[in-house]
Amino acid sequence: MPFVLLIFAVSICLEMLVAMLLNRKLYDFDDTLHNLVMFFANRMMGGLGGAFMFAMLAAAAQFVPWKLSGTVGGILTFLIVDLLYYLQHRVFHSDTIFAPFHEVHHTSEQYNLTTTLRASVFLPFVNPLFYAPAMLLGCDPPAVIVCFALIQIYQLFLHTQLVPPIALLEGIINTPSAHRVHHGNKRSQYESNLGGVLLVWDRLLGTYRRETDDLIFGMKGVKPEKNYFVAQVSPFVVYAKRILKRINSGIGQH
């Protein structure tokens, strides 16, 4: 993992350099600083979250007598985990209690490699709910963790505006072009291209969308918070207020 982070840090520096050479304002100091603060703060909880996820998956695996093994088992495990990633991502973009766990990732109005560092500190504690089904299919907990980590690493390098559409890969695997669409502020955009590595799931389930010129990054009506704690908590507060308003409206109609 340290080697991956080193490569990622170098990639950020290169993106900054290329952006300056091309005279493109891809980075905002405050936004970048906030993303980095969020990353390092979340890293402090990362070990605990990862341990919790492994413990929950291992507990679920105890109830399943069959196991996937060998090369075929590894390939199947990756496909299963990638599909579950798609389903989790789709739930995160629905109007449910899970939406606040993902909102902070989409609130930035900038879009560069540091955008991928934006994440809810609470996210690791809901991940087991979505990947436990892999245990029922015979996946090995360590293999699921590895596949999940590989998807996360792959996602690191999708958040860039400098890579154009890659014709042969678009609609097959996730690309920077496809992921840019996902970070658009229109509902039809951020509810599309939800796959982790493969976009086959989006193709099959009708959520694939090609990149167009009308992209504006961020979320309509939601300003990015610069305070780490406010950024982490406010999505849940806003969601709770919305639910209470619906409840009160329902009571008022009777």
Model-derived features with residue positions:
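Generic alpha-helix structural propensity
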Residues: 27-31, 35, 39-43, 47-52
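Hydrophobic transmembrane alpha-helical segments in integral membrane proteins
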Residues: 1-9
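Membrane-interface helix-loop junction between the first two transmembrane segments
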Residues: 14-33
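A membrane-cytosol interface segment of integral membrane proteins
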Residues: 216-254
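Coil-to-alpha-helix initiation sites in intrinsically disordered, low-complexity, charged segments
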Residues: 27, 31, 112, 167, ...
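Juxtamembrane/interfacial segments at transmembrane-helix boundaries in multi-pass membrane proteins
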Residues: 52-72
